[in-house]
Amino acid sequence: MHSNSTIEKSVNSLADSLVIRQLNTMDYSQVWHAMKDFTDNRDDTTADELWLVEHPAVFTQGQAGKAEHLLVPGDIEVVKVDRGGQVTYHGPGQLVVYVMINLRRKKIGVRQLVTLIENSIVSALTDYDIAAYAKADAPGVYVDEKKIASLGLRVRKGCSFHGLAMNVNMDLSPFLRINPCGYAGLEMVQTADLQGPKDTASASTALVKHLINLLKANNVSHQVGLPNENNKYHE
């Protein structure tokens, strides 16, 4: 038998734990299915995770997505997904961070998590003297009214998945084939053009330290590759 104090101590310890998982470049659908499996299989003994990845070119359309926002997808694959929001683009040179957090254990709501993620991005860009900001009416992070980072989350069983995408050093032209996040004419910008990080590795280092800080994670571990299904994602 575990005493209540032992269980509480274990839960508090897990609330402080965070796994940073480097996936390098990986197909969008493969990662999407893996994060759904991770979320479906996790329980109160599963540590929270951040997955860092770049995707080959793909448009993803959220649950609110309307076909008219896909202007000219052309030869780029379109994947309909289960996150909030409209259509966005992922491609090489963009840092994507998937945020798998047990919100009940952290005692935060999804709106608080959105704000935390936005603040982490703003802080990372501030380190490079980039004047970035969030908007109350349009999730994401902006510089001079141009969007530098997009955000889309889903919550299942009290746990978040999906996450953020920050433009680092990429071909931005595919964004012209869509209305990004459902906003016609919304301009996109990237860190490499603003004296910020020139590659996703540098951007990742800058961003992750602020995510760790704002998530109050004191027990951080680093892993490479998708979780091993045999361990059921438990610590």
Swiss-Prot record:
Domain of life, source organism: Bacteria
Entry binding sites for substrate: 83-90, 150-152, 163-165
Record NCBIfam families: lipB, PRK14342.1
Gene Ontology annotations of biological process type: protein modification process
Pathway: Protein modification; protein lipoylation via endogenous pathway; protein N(6)-(lipoyl)lysine from octanoyl-[acyl-carrier-protein]: step 1/2
Principal place of residence: cytoplasm
Acyltransferase in keyword set: yes
Keyword Cytoplasm appears in the UniProt entry: yes
Localization in the cell: Cytoplasm
Record's function text: Catalyzes the transfer of endogenously produced octanoic acid from octanoyl-acyl-carrier-protein onto the lipoyl domains of lipoate-dependent enzymes. Lipoyl-ACP can also act as a substrate although octanoyl-ACP is likely to be the physiological substrate.
Domain BPL/LPL catalytic: 44-231
Catalytic reactions on record: octanoyl-[ACP] + L-lysyl-[protein] = N(6)-octanoyl-L-lysyl-[protein] + holo-[ACP] + H(+)
Source lineage: Bacteria, Pseudomonadati, Pseudomonadota, Gammaproteobacteria, Alteromonadales
GO cellular component term of the entry, any: cytoplasm
Active site: 181 (acyl-thioester intermediate)
EC number: 2.3.1.181
Protein name: Octanoyltransferase
Pfam families: LplA-B_cat
Similarity comment: family membership: Belongs to the LipB family.
MF GO annotations: lipoyl(octanoyl) transferase activity
Group of enzyme by EC: transferase
Miscellaneous comment text of the record: In the reaction, the free carboxyl group of octanoic acid is attached via an amide linkage to the epsilon-amino group of a specific lysine residue of lipoyl domains of lipoate-dependent enzymes.
Site (Lowers pKa of active site Cys): 147
Keywords: Acyltransferase, Cytoplasm, Transferase
